[in-house]
Amino acid sequence: MVYSVAMNQSYSEKTTLIDAREMGEALDSIEIHAPEYAKAKAERIHLDDYRKVQLALLYEHAEGRTVVEKESWCKAHAQYREVLTEHANAVERETALYWKLKLAETQIEVWRTIQASRRREAQIL
């Protein structure tokens, strides 16, 4: 859905850019993406916690005599880096779905504003 408006369009032409069909699409988008977003957020939160657990498990087997040496060994370990990659992917997915939902909500708000403006304009005329 692209809402670019040419400068030479009248106000009434601009207000027809968002119609009932597109409102339905925005609502459908929310219905589709809300459960996906919830799942992505749950996955990201799980990986936040799992990252800490993985670090603790690796720390038990860490090489080094000081805490700093052990932490460095753990954070350089392939298993920990794998968890970090999974976490980054989860954050990316959650963020993408969040913005899809936000876009649909914004489209609905624009439509509502246009409808309110039309009602006010009809009262004036």
Predicted regions span which residues?
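Acidic, gly/ser/pro-rich intrinsically disordered tails
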Residues: 1-2, 125
